[in-house]
A protein has these predicted regions:
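N-terminal hydrophobic/helix-forming segments and targeting peptides
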Residues: 1-161
């Protein structure tokens, strides 16, 4: 059987944003089908593994529960200067996003970016907290046309590194 460190490494490399957990479900199904008697995938994509007891007398039921999804962001608007406006996918605190490296994944193409905002001293106040409307992603595009050439578009999801 795989070592737990290898299992965790494999699982952490899968991009499984909220609402797009199918890749994780497929990995779990293929990797662990040899250890169980039945696998059920329901209409919401949840994966259930069943291992029958060898001895039904005095057997205990055990359940292990885990999320298959991760948080992320989605493009809501492309600015003329090439910056991307974003919104959250899943429960994440806005301030946690600031300075995070992210990856847009589109058809085997990975487009890296970093989340930024206008610093408080430039905004003219000491309020460090940023609403989503104050955050943007820099992907290195010099303008909107360059961002569009990189296949960036509204509703494109991305993974937070």
């Amino acid at each position: 059987m795989e070592r737990i460190s290898q299992i965790l490494d494999n699982l952490s490399k899968i991009k499984s944003l909220s609402g797009k957990e199918n890749q994780m479900g497929e990995y779990l199904h293929s990797a662990y089908k040899k250890y169980v008697d039945r696998i059920v995938i329901d209409n919401r994509g949840n994966v259930f593994f069943h291992k029958d007891a060898l001895n039904l007398e005095n057997c205990k039921n055990v359940m292990i529960l885990a999320h298959m999804d991760t948080i992320g962001v989605m493009v809501t608007h492309i600015e003329e200067n090439g910056y991307l406006r974003i919104d959250k996918i899943g429960g994440i605190i806005n301030s946690v996003l600031l300075g995070k490296k992210i990856e847009f994944i589109k058809e085997n193409q990975i487009i890296p970016g970093i989340v930024g905002s206008i610093p408080p001293h430039v905004k003219g106040n000491d309020n460090i907290s940023n609403g989503m409307s104050e955050l943007w992603v820099d992907i290195g595009a010099r303008n909107k046309e360059e961002a569009l050439k990189d296949n960036i578009h509204r509703r494109l999801w991305c993974h937070i590194k």
